[in-house]
Amino acid sequence: MEVVKGRGYVYSIQYHIVWCVKYRRDVLNGQVAIKLKELLPQISKDNGFQILEMTIEEDHIRMLINCTPQHYIPNIIKAMKGVSARLLMKEFGDDLRSKLWGGHLWNPSYFVATVSENTEEQIIEYIRSQKRK
């Protein structure tokens, strides 16, 4: 767990985040999953946080992120879900709309938990082990 020094403060902030496809449909596969693996790191870079670990399942995403004290978790989620949905719908819209309805890719809810120095390795191993065989 990396401790970062800012101007007037020292921090180490990690979150374990999970969110699902609307209706838990299996749509995050093939070219959609490949594109999503490219998009999410770019979105994190554009918004100033870092994805430390990530797995993309057919119906949900798990990740461990590192961010600064200035980040607000709902804004991080909004950026990742909003930008990725817009770009995936633009590129794969017909295929996605055939499996989803209402024009929504992501379920509006999400799971987030803070990560401590004691649990970071456990969460990384958990995220890695959740890949479907």
Whereabouts are the PLM-identified features?
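Basic nucleic-acid-binding interfaces
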Residues: 1-133
